[in-house]
């Protein structure tokens, strides 16, 4: 009989004493509360510099899983780019310089697209502002902005403030015009809803979609129709004569300034894959010799990379594999890349002895319509694996508290927490029945704050600490832990030596 050591990541499950707007506190969760009271527990920091982000920056799933899997603080793309701007290296970046040289020589346009907010999860508008300043410095005349509106990592109705900030930089530099506006629901889909991506592509390339004289007018009209930032229809900004300010054409260059890959891949593929088949792009398929991605998005995206990946050696998955242990990664679609690619330090391939189980997320418009998502199917599949004695190490993600938490709606999020708790109980009982040990934690908060103090929906992640429980009564845990300390703790429990690259410290005293 194998005695599995399982890491259970309750995505978006933060801890906060205040119960107002706190779906985690208001939900009935007898299993979690029981384990918290019965077993050694502590809290971990999952935001800011503890996970390689700027101070005070909320954590997110990509960052959380990278830090957990690496067993160290992993300096994030946001921090890397910020430092490059601060130290003057950003403007010297060869990939940016090559794109600028190309448009200057050919007299073509430079298009900047990405998520326009200061959420810092997928992008940061300061990086786009740095690109505007660089373009101005280098004498690029035609610079067009294709703004993806957020409303998810920031407040749901905040787009206007980011448009205003952009207009200030346009005024300061003398370059840049808004060309298209679209909500991230369309431009940043990651679930193969290609009909959404197609609307965005057609606006950018063909000038198809609702037309407005300004970005401000687009947002105002959307709000008047009850459509907020995330869901704004891909729209085209037009000149006085109703012609598009700009479309993307042959020999133009693109800099896609999102730094997080998962929601950038699909739209990038439409522009970079010659044999793209997910939808018919129509007669006009612009040839873009310089398509620049801020970071490495995927092998499926044929673009240049401005900030190339940093190699993360000896992640938990690799160390476990080298020790000859069998490991399982399991999640539903929305969090599958997190327990595989991100947890393995940005590696797509499996390690020897690694098995992966993907359970499809339900096809609903938004997850508040189905707060349980596919958690029961994930749980059934995992309990079956545990009972069959197949794995020494299990990495599980329950997506609900995060994905439903993003709705900013209390009732569905409470249901999500309660479904998570029910399934947590089933998984932990199966592990304990095999004399195994479960480590229960989260990658960041979300469901712990669903309402602002004004009673408005709070759709973003939080900076609250996350739980850490070890279902083993003969250990003592220290305070001040961070996500990067989880892997060393697991290795302690497994009796496997911690490699020098893992600079985290075990939480077991």
Swiss-Prot record:
The keyword Metal-binding applies. Keywords: Glycolysis, Isomerase, Manganese, Metal-binding, Phosphoprotein, Sporulation. Its cofactor is Mn(2+). Substrate binds at residues 122, 152-153, 184, 190, 260-263, 335. This is 2,3-bisphosphoglycerate-independent phosphoglycerate mutase. Essential for rapid growth and for sporulation. Catalyzes the interconversion of 2-phosphoglycerate and 3-phosphoglycerate. The lineage of its organism: Bacteria, Bacillati, Bacillota, Bacilli, Bacillales. Binds 2 manganese ions per subunit. InterPro entries: Alkaline_phosphatase_core_sf (IPR017850), BPG-indep_PGM_N (IPR011258), Metalloenzyme (IPR006124), PGAM_B_sf (IPR036646), Pgm_bpd_ind (IPR005995). Belongs to the BPG-independent phosphoglycerate mutase family. The gene is gpmI. Gene3D superfamilies: Alkaline Phosphatase, subunit A, BPG-independent phosphoglycerate mutase, domain B. Mn(2+) 1 binds at residues 402, 406, 461. One of its GO terms (molecular function) is manganese ion binding.
């Amino acid at each position: 009989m194998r005695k599995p050591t399982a890491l259970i990541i309750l995505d978006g499950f933060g801890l906060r004493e205040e119960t107002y707007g706190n779906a985690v506190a208001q939900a009935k969760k007898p299993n979690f509360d029981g384990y918290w009271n019965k077993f050694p527990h502590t809290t971990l920091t999952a935001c800011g510099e503890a996970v390689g982000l700027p101070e005070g920056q909320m954590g997110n799933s990509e960052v959380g899983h990278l830090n957990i899997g690496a067993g160290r603080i992993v300096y994030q793309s946001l921090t890397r780019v910020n430092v490059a701007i601060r130290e003057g290296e950003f403007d010297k970046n060869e990939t940016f310089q090559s794109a600028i040289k190309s448009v200057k020589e050919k007299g073509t346009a430079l298009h900047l697209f990405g998520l326009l907010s200061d959420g810092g999860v997928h992008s940061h508008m300061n990086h786009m502002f740095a690109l505007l300043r660089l373009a101005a410095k280098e004498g690029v005349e035609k610079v067009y902005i294709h703004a993806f509106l957020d409303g998810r990592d920031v407040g749901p109705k905040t787009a206007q403030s980011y448009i205003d900030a952009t207009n200030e930089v346009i005024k300061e530099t003398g370059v840049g015009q808004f060309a298209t506006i679209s909500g991230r629901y369309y431009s940043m889909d990651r679930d193969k809803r290609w009909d959404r991506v197609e609307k965005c592509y057609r606006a950018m390339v063909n000038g198809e979609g609702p037309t407005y004289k300004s970005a401000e007018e687009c947002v105002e009209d959307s709000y008047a129709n009850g459509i907020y930032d995330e869901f704004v229809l891909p729209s085209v900004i037009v000149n006085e004569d109703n012609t598009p300010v700009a479309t993307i054409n042959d020999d133009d260059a693109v800099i896609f300034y999102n730094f997080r890959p998962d929601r950038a891949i699909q739209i990038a593929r439409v522009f970079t894959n010659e044999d793209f088949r997910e939808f018919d792009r129509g007669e006009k398929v612009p040839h873009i010799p310089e398509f620049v991605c801020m970071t490495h998005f995927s092998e499926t995206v044929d673009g240049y990379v401005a900030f190339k990946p940093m190699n993360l050696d000896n992640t938990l998955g690799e160390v476990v594999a080298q020790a000859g242990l069998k490991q399982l990664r399991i999640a539903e679609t929305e969090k599958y890349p997190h327990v595989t690619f991100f947890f393995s330090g940005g590696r797509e391939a499996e390690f020897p002895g690694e098995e992966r189980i993907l359970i499809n997320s339900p096809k609903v418009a938004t997850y508040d319509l189905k707060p349980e998502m596919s958690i029961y199917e994930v749980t059934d599949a995992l309990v079956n694996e545990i009972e069959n004695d197949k794995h020494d190490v299990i990495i599980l993600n329950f997506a609900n508290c995060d994905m439903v938490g993003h709705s900013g709606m209390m009732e569905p999020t409470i249901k999500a927490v309660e479904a998570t708790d029910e399934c947590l109980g089933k998984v932990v009982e199966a592990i304990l029945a095999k004399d195994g040990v479960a480590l229960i934690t989260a990658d960041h908060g979300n469901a712990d704050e669903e309402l602002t103090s004004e009673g408005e929906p709070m759709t973003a992640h939080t900076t609250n600490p996350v739980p850490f429980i070890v279902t083993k009564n003969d250990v003592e845990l220290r305070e001040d832990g961070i996500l990067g300390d989880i892997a060393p703790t697991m290795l302690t429990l497994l009796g496997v030596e911690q490699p020098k690259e893992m600079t985290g410290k075990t939480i077991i005293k």
